Design a protein with these regions (language model features):
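Solvent-exposed loop segments that connect transmembrane elements
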Residues: 1, 41-86, 126-177, 215-243, ...
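Residues on the lipid-exposed face of transmembrane beta-strands in outer-membrane beta-barrel proteins
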Residues: 15-19, 101-105, 116, 190-194, ...
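Transmembrane beta-strands of outer-membrane beta-barrel pores
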Residues: 31-37, 107-109, 118-124, 196-198, ...
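Short loop/turn motifs that connect adjacent beta-strands in outer-membrane beta-barrel proteins
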Residues: 24-28, 40, 106-113, 262-272, ...
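C-terminal structural cap/anchor segments
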Residues: 244-347
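Residues that define the transmembrane beta-barrel architecture of outer-membrane proteins
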Residues: 9-13, 95-99, 184-188, 249-253, ...
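Outer-membrane beta-barrel "beta-signal"
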Residues: 370, 411-427
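Outer membrane beta-barrel
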Residues: 1-56, 314, 343, 352-357, ...
Length: 427
């Protein structure tokens, strides 16, 4: 909360060019080189096992997750549970491109700057793909027909590429899961920046095509077992790049205001800012069956707490009073921030969730405008449901009282407040 943009962006290999065409018109272009040009360009999260981790199996240090109790648990040396192991990520095609063009126009009559933008990019966040190696509902005849290995009853190794009998018994490997990153996302945007009555106004509106949507894991099965109404795909349909999850066309909007409050009996000066965000899904163009906001009349219903809504609205507010020269060369500040989803759940990952967000409050010292010390308390909040799920008995995978479904990342770490000390300087 309250982080500056320059604290969040990672260096990437690429180039930017800009030209001032006229006194009021400028043109800019940027190009980032391939996905592997700087390790890779996916977002970085608090890693598996760390204090702020929200999904240990899903991050770079993730190795496996439990899927069921093992039928071989009684055998000596066999694990109690079956697991899916982390497989190779499906990354964007290096040739899919990450580039953009921008036009900015600042006519004197408007006393404002208008912008128009185009971006071709790929998603920095992933969707999940799950490839089961073991099935428990496949008759022996069907198992043999698809080239599987019958294990008795309706148990069948349906995919020998991801497991075998030895791995099942000794390691409990029942399949693999993969992170898949969307590509070929086209974004068209407009922007406005202007001073209104001493307040800085900024606004953006963007339309995105092929945008990855919040999805359940896509299952990969032998072709005869595929159920299209569940969003499943055949082993021969696994993409070499991109994602098999839900994609769609979305619209996004932002309006922000920044201002200054003059001297009062409480402070020497203060700055404030507020930002309203909005997004909506216009159309689902790929694999709606795994989209968490899917049409429940057409597909298997999804009605859990994190179901996306038609529209999402989020609000962020910050306020920082300042006291000059409380000590020679030292200015004191008290930065405070709050941000949350105020209506609806976003259809894009990390886009925001209703009643979920963060807040922070602290003190800061700016020493000779060269070194800044910040001490702040940071908290997270959000809604979640607990086990057992309504209508289901408690299980070993979801013991009574454990978190079942979290409505967004901040809900998942709502018990992990912390105090942060930051020291930064410019040189």
């Amino acid at each position: 909360p309250g982080a500056e943009a320059k604290e969040l962006f990672r260096p990437r290999v690429g180039f930017n060019v800009q030209s001032q065409v006229t006194d009021t018109l400028s043109v800019a272009a940027q190009y980032f080189f391939n996905w592997q040009s700087f390790d890779n360009q996916a977002y970085r999260y608090p890693e598996s096992g760390t204090y702020l981790s929200v999904g240990d199996p899903l991050l770079w240090a993730g190795e496996s997750f439990i899927v069921a109790r093992s039928p071989f648990a009684a055998l000596p040396g066999s694990p109690d549970y079956l697991r899916a192991w982390r497989g190779k990520d499906i990354e964007p095609d290096d040739n899919s491109g990450n580039y953009g063009l921008a036009l900015r126009w600042s006519p004197l009559w408007a006393d404002a700057t208008f912008g128009a933008y185009y971006r071709r990019t790929y998603d920095m966040q992933f969707q999940l793909m799950l490839t089961p190696g073991l099935a428990t509902t496949v008759p022996a005849a069907t198992c043999t027909a698809i080239g599987g290995q019958p294990l008795g009853g309706t148990n069948c190794i349906i995919n020998k590429q991801v497991t075998d009998l030895s791995l099942l018994r000794s390691k409990g490997k029942a399949g693999e899961y993969n992170a898949a990153f969307g590509e070929d996302i086209d974004m068209f945007g407009l922007s406005l920046s202007k001073q209104v009555l001493g307040v800085s106004l900024g606004a953006e509106l963007s339309y995105r095509q092929n945008m990855p949507l919040v999805s359940e894991a896509v299952q990969v099965l032998p072709a005869p077992l595929v159920n299209r109404s569940r969003g499943q795909i055949a082993t021969t349909e696994v993409p070499k790049s991109g994602t098999p999850g839900a994609l769609g066309d979305t619209m996004h909007g932002i309006v922000n205001l920044l201002g200054i409050v003059g001297t009062t009996p409480l402070w020497d000066t203060a700055t404030w800012g507020t930002e309203l965000t909005w997004m909506t899904v216009l159309d689902v163009t790929q694999n709606e069956a795994v989209y968490k906001g899917r049409d429940n009349n057409k597909y298997l219903p999804y009605n859990l707490l994190d179901r996306p809504d038609d529209n999402f609205f989020g609000l962020a507010v910050n306020f920082t009073p300042t006291w000059f020269q409380v000590l020679p060369g030292v200015d004191m500040l008290a930065p405070m921030t709050w941000s949350a989803g105020v209506a609806g759940n976003s259809a894009v990952t990390f886009g925001g969730n209703e009643d979920g967000g963060t807040w922070s409050a602290g003190i800061a010292a700016d020493v000779r405008q060269r070194v800044r010390f910040d001490l702040k308390y940071v908290a997270f909040f959000g809604d979640y449901t607990k086990c057992p799920r309504k209508g289901s008995p408690p299980t070993g995978f979801c013991p009574t009282g454990a978190m079942d479904v979290n409505n967004g990342v901040t809900a998942a770490i709502s018990d992990r407040d912390f105090v942060a000390l930051t020291i930064k300087t410019t040189f």
